[in-house]
Amino acid sequence: MTTAGRGLMPRSLSILLASMIADVSDVSASAHAQDWIFDELRFGASASVQSGGEREDGVFPEVTIFFDPFGSDSAANWTQKLIRPRIHLGTSIGTGSEATQVFSGFSWTADFNDKLFAEAGFGGLIHTGNLDEEDDRPALGCHLLFHEYIGVGYRFDTHWNVMAQVAHSSHANLCDGPNDGMTRAGVQIGYKF
């Protein structure tokens, strides 16, 4: 990648993130004019769970914002929850020379009781990682990838929760080049507004 290419990627990520926040904030604000724009904020860290040359070194700080423009929190049953997902927007920050991710998509939460829950999400991401098989990092093939995650969590009260999750990103062989993907596992602390 050229020096010019490296400079464009972070600027492209910033522009994409800003436009996604603006678009989602408009939807969320109109749906919940009386409520907070954000439904939940999560922060934490993850690490690569891959092995060999596909493993990423270091710890990845993470921040995720959730919006509830479809009223998922007020859904009365699982079928309503399924058709009324929350929207998430977040980042997993690469330390050292590892990939930074900016991701967005839909999230579904299943409550086992007032305290225990499971969550799944699906969407896409853009990253700053390695595209070709040049070194001991995942070769990702293209900058736009699918992003999915699953997790289990515990609510301490109506606001605070903790969740362990595993997230995977790859292009599902839809673009040319290698498809090592990135798989990270971690813990996040959440605050629900």
Predicted feature locations:
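Cleavable N-terminal export/targeting peptides
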Residues: 1-36
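Short coil turns and loop connectors of transmembrane beta-barrels in diderm outer membranes
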Residues: 37, 83, 98, 112-114, ...
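Repeated loop/turn-to-beta-strand initiation elements of outer-membrane beta-barrel proteins
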Residues: 41, 70-75, 114-118, 158-164
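Outer-membrane beta-barrel strand-turn architecture
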Residues: 67-71, 79-81, 110-114, 156-158, ...
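Transmembrane beta-strand segments that form the barrel wall of outer-membrane beta-barrel proteins
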Residues: 41-49, 84-95, 166-170
